Amino acid sequence: LIILKLSFHKCQFMKKLLFIISIATLAACQPSPNLDGVAEKPAVADLLSAIQLKGDSTKVVLTDYFPDNKVVDSITIPDFFRYSYSPDSASITLVANNLNLPPLSIIQVWVKGNERYDLLVRKSKKLPVAFTFDPEGKKVKSVQLAGQINDWNPNATSLTFDGKVFRTTLLLNPGKYHYQVVVNGKWMLDPANPLKEDNGMGGQNSVVEVGNLKPNMLPKLVALTAHKNILNIKATGTVDSIIVLWQNYLLTGNFIKRDGDVFHVTLPRNAEEYSRSYIRVWAYNEFGESNDLLIPLEGCRVVEDPGKLTRSDKHTQVMYFLMVDRFNNGTTANDRKVDDPEILPKANYFGGDLVGVTQKIKDGYFTSLGINTIWLSPITQNPLGAWGLYPNPRTKFSGYHGYWPVSLTKIDFRYGTDGDLRELIDEAHSRNMNVILDYVANHIHVEHPLYKQHPDWTTSLYLPDGSLNTERWDEYRLTTWFDVFLPTLDLQRPEVYEPMTDTALYWLTNFQLDGFRHDATKHIHENFWRRLTQKIKLKVTDRSIYQIGETYGSRELVASYIGSGMLDSQFDFNIYDASVAAFARSNYPFSSLNSSLLESFSYFGWNNLMGYISGNQDRGRFISYAGGALRFDEDAKKAGWTREIGVGDTSAYSKLCMLNAFNLTIPGVPTIYYGDEFGMPGGNDPDNRRMMKFDNLSPIENRTLDVVKKLVNLRRNTMALNYGNFETLLADSTQYAYARTYLQSSAIVVFNKSDEDKSIIFKLPDYMVGRNFTSKFGSNSSIQNQIVKVDLKPNSFEILISK
């Protein structure tokens, strides 16, 4: 080892930082088998996320991993990296030699002298992709690209004319990308690319597929068995190396023993001091990395009983999103509509409140559904008047939804009081439910006192050319205003993000909330998210806090806000779009949904905390699309204003059950939008925000509700559906089957979206041979010679659970 001792006098966080650069390979630098680097009270309690290397260089901000980075003493960096250190930002910039860099590697951080943390590093998978456009002799001033490659922002990617053609080369991760060419401002399909696909809105996009993916050549991992303090991991395919972390500590030497394709992991005795800790496992070979495993421990034993899981185990959440004003009116004493004749009834207050939510908690509605996390829409004070304008039919709007704050700490009197919120949280906690709050950080309303006191704290309403900077979602995503009366806060500036993060923290320190859903995440500078998360980790240490964001855009953009120091997750709208298309439309194949899901896993991990939704307040209701009452090629908002939107064909209820079955059986956090448990119809905003219906459900609505209750119960009580691996068994145009296994718990999920009875036939994975399964939804099934057959009716599903 060469030890470089460097003092950084400019650094305000660290007096000294030592970089220890390994000349030998990292594999030769094995930590002590006794895990001597584990502290009794670790400086970091959370699982530290992997460092995802980007193109040429990657910036690693130390406070992302160590909120109090004064404790960091030294860092061990493998010799296939070059590095630089910035004392001003307390960050390291890594430059990797991709020729020698394995798919996965480890960087070690030493804290307080001898306390060690091992950070996983994932190699960049980006590949160069060339795009060209031939003007064919025509006069062309500009050629741009817009698509999933750049979040549909044509100004982000311009092609250069070389005298013959326009061209550019982009670095893209493996996957499928929709895009269009923008020529002289006109959007069109790429004339040089014959590949195109439906865009889900009645049109088409060009498609580019990046990378020669060989998923069958990658290693696959499954947690096979556990006995006392031994965990047995089976690997399928060639494994060049396996990486096992307990918490944030690499296990090597006697902790890992290989016997053919099975790895025996001895759990460290340090785990005895923890009521909950985790084993994380990855493997790789020359073709890339495997799926990852997450294994919860209780003491020095693997958790196998779902009864031992708690609401603090984030991966076991089943979330329910309700709009407070539209859920239940618990008391009419606080009812107050906006008295303005220009507001049509749909856009005014309906009277729902916090007392109404608490009543439904006490009544057992959420318990009967199986929900363990309630997501409340924003509850801060909103304006008393009418704002905005919709042209046809002409109407203004109230702030019934809660997204127009005129205060950041005061509860809107139309929703209730501080005491009402505390009672709601207490009642939820007493029933083992979390409560997370929808928090609006991006903007305030013009009536907010802050705007009058500090108008300079906002971005400009006007662009340099004099045009309005409103609804420029992608082109000016960090500065755009949502409307002329909603100033965007300039949250990259310390004088703005410091008080604003304190305000967000207020809700966690004054109420026992369990987390946030963050509105408009991609429109907020990362400085805000880093500072907020740092404050939460330093000041809210008595409970687990879950932060989930909202970003519409590419997976790369979504992922940029996730990780240690940022958010736990975001909602995966790319999967939502694919699942809506797959389950509501006959011409979108399951194979495309499966490919999209695997692509999400490659960005967010196979044991992610992403939100997988049945719908939300910004989309037309799924059931109305599935039944044909709402068309994919129409303006769903206009449709909701101009006609009564119903369900349409009753097959939509079966399709809704399939969508809920999908969300509740894949990795991630399944999220039910209120009313989707029985099939509430509607167009887009505000028609998708009708008053919740608890009584007088039709027979088919009751059957749908019963199916969803059963699905949630299966999710909550099947370890494989919370922590199991994911393996695709069949995916074609109308048939889909996948399996999840966690030790002795296995689940097989099968779909038939055709209009006729089908026998779905597929092969059982070798490691599941010998397990006995039972059909939970009444379909006939059989297994003979490793071949599974499940008989399914049209638009139906089945879940087989190992006995």
What residue ranges belong to the model's regions?
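C-terminal motif of bacterial Sec signal peptides marking the signal peptidase cleavage site
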Residues: 27-28
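Solvent-exposed, low-complexity, repeat-rich "mucin-like" stalks and linkers
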Residues: 34-79, 220-237
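Active-site-proximal helices and loops of the catalytic beta/alpha 8
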Residues: 44, 49, 58, 503-505, ...
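Aromatic-rich carbohydrate-binding modules that target alpha-glucans
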Residues: 120-174, 184-211, 243-265
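C-terminal beta-strand-rich structural cap/linker in extracellular carbohydrate-active enzymes
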Residues: 178-179, 784-803
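Substrate-binding/active-site clefts of carbohydrate-active enzymes
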Residues: 313, 317, 325-511, 531-541, ...
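Loop/helix patches that line or flank the sugar-binding groove of alpha-linked glycan CAZymes
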Residues: 314, 330-349, 601-769, 792, ...
